[in-house]
Amino acid sequence: AYDIDYKRLFDIGYRGIIFDIDNTLVPHGADADFAAESLFSRLNELGFAVILLTDNDESRTARFNKNIGALYICNAEKPDPAPYNEAVKMLGLKKDEVIVIGDSMFKDILGAYNASIASIMVKYIGDGKKWLGWHRYMEYALLFAWHFGRYYKKLGGIGLTEKSSFFKNFKLFLKHEMLFCDISPACYK
């Protein structure tokens, strides 16, 4: 989430951002750190309206949001499109002016798709100690298949810097335990 060119997003017409919290902005359960606070300050300077959309409860969300001061929706039950639509309404924008940023294909990105909102999948932020859940394996399989599909041939990689790195990481995955973000180069950092 920290490597995205937000000025470019603003220049092409986006005015609102819906953020996931855990593993997108900070490791799971962590409070907002200096990087997160700086990011939100920069987004405000650029003119973005920002809202947090999370499956976390009120106390966790409020704790993260203490120094950020963003709007938020907690207990969202993603990928249900209703909270995404509510977030757009709270921002006071149209869907084509809003983009979702999250780390989970089956929650954040699928929810955005279900609500007809653009999205960016970012690299999972983790401490490296937790092993992947089943949905991370499914994400890996889908991103692997992306490389052989017609849209990849048409559109190219999604944030790829080195074409062969995907296959190199796949070989490493077979030999060692790795987090999803270490496997897939198809995400922002």
Regions found by a protein language model. Give the residues of each.
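Asp-based, Mg2+/Mn2+-dependent phosphohydrolase catalytic module
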Residues: 1-19, 25-31, 37-100, 104-189
